[in-house]
Regions:
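Phosphopantetheine-dependent thiolation modules in NRPS/PKS and related acyl-activating systems
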Residues: 1-44, 48-54, 58-59, 63-90
Length: 90
């Protein structure tokens, strides 16, 4: 993975979480790799997950298959960012 590309993906993931979940820019800016997401953010319920994944697909130009979606990828900000980077950057 290229560092520049990874940072772009991280910024995109932050933007998606901010926009889809209605989180403040300040709150999302404080997210670290170990910041818990699903089960810890009340805004990220099962319905919101679909919106987040769809928006990631649109913004990153990727396709997320149903069988790729699991609790681990949504466990933390770092896990979601790594998943998105893996799809976007190959």
């Amino acid at each position: 993975m290229q560092p520049d590309g990874s940072l772009q993906v991280e910024d995109t993931v932050r933007g998606v979480l901010r926009d889809v979940l209605g989180l403040s820019a300040e709150r999302v800016a404080d997210f670290r790799a170990d910041t818990p997401l699903f089960g810890a953010l009340p805004e990220l319920d099962s319905l919101a997950v679909a919106g987040v994944l769809t928006e990631l697909e649109d913004r990153l130009g990727i396709l997320i298959e149903d069988d790729e979606v699991d609790g681990e990828m949504l466990e933390s900000f770092g896990a979601l960012t790594r998943f998105a980077a893996g799809k976007a950057l190959g």
